[in-house]
């Protein structure tokens, strides 16, 4: 695997192809700049990886209700602050780790920017999906509804949930109504349409998980059979 970049989803718009004039729906992501905060090696951690940080943590404090009240950072713990001091940068709110084969190309404090990618490249985008609250069987699992005729008593019910006396219970994992969305989701093999290095913007074809303002992780596509 290779290192990726963190960013913020700004919203959607459209761009036009120069040759055909065809409109392409794109999502605009403000990606980076990120800072390398830790380098893991086989000798120290048992595997090779690069940790990057994104988004400067605001200098806001909160008071701990301890025997001796004290002020601490609202967004970072003491352990996180101490960890970030080693990289020599400003306190960063979000940290992510990417497995890499070789860490020789990275150093603490190094900046990761959108020039890591190129137009036309395929990427995997990870983010938290939009929460939709409590949802029924049709909306959550795409169940087929029952007949809508006057005599039907099963319009949007699930049907059977399992056997009867034996086992006398509903098996774990049964698809039922419940909370929908607000989970970590990865959309794979999306195409980068344009890159704006001056404004740290990536224009990615199609939609990506989350609403505007969502933290997004973008990494080169993990295609089966290719390194």
From Swiss-Prot:
Keywords: Ribonucleoprotein, Ribosomal protein, RNA-binding, rRNA-binding. Residues 144-166 are annotated as: Disordered. This is Large ribosomal subunit protein uL3. The keyword Secreted does not apply. It holds the Pfam family Ribosomal_L3. The keyword Transcription regulation does not apply. One of the primary rRNA binding proteins, it binds directly near the 3'-end of the 23S rRNA, where it nucleates assembly of the 50S subunit. One of its GO terms (cellular component) is cytosolic large ribosomal subunit. GO terms for molecular function: rRNA binding; structural constituent of ribosome. It comes from Trichodesmium erythraeum (strain IMS101). GO terms for biological process: translation. Part of the 50S ribosomal subunit. Forms a cluster with proteins L14 and L19. Belongs to the universal ribosomal protein uL3 family.
């Amino acid at each position: 695997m290779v290192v990726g970049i963190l960013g913020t989803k700004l919203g959607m718009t459209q761009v036009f192809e120069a040759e055909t004039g065809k409109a392409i729906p794109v999502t605009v992501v403000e990606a980076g700049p990120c800072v390398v905060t830790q380098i893991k090696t086989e000798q120290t951690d048992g595997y090779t990886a690069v940790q990057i940080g994104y988004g400067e943590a605001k200098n806001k404090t909160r008071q701990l209700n301890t025997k001796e009240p004290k002020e601490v950072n609202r967004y970072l713990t003491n352990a996180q602050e101490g960890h970030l001091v080693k990289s020599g940068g400003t306190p960063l709110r979000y940290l992510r780790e990417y497995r890499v084969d070789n860490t020789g190309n990275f150093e603490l404090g190094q900046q990761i920017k959108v020039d890591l990618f190129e137009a036309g490249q395929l990427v995997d985008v990870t983010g938290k999906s939009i929460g939709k609250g409590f949802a029924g069987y049709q909306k959550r699992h795409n169940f087929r509804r029952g007949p809508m005729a006057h005599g039907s008593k099963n319009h949007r019910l699930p049907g059977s949930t399992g056997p009867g006396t034996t086992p006398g219970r509903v098996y774990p994992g049964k698809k039922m109504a419940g909370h929908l969305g607000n989970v970590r989701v990865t959309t794979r093999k999306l195409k980068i349409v344009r890159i704006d290095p001056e404004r740290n913007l990536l224009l990615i074809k199609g939609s990506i998980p989350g609403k505007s303002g969502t933290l997004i992780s973008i990494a080169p596509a993990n295609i089966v059979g290719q390194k």
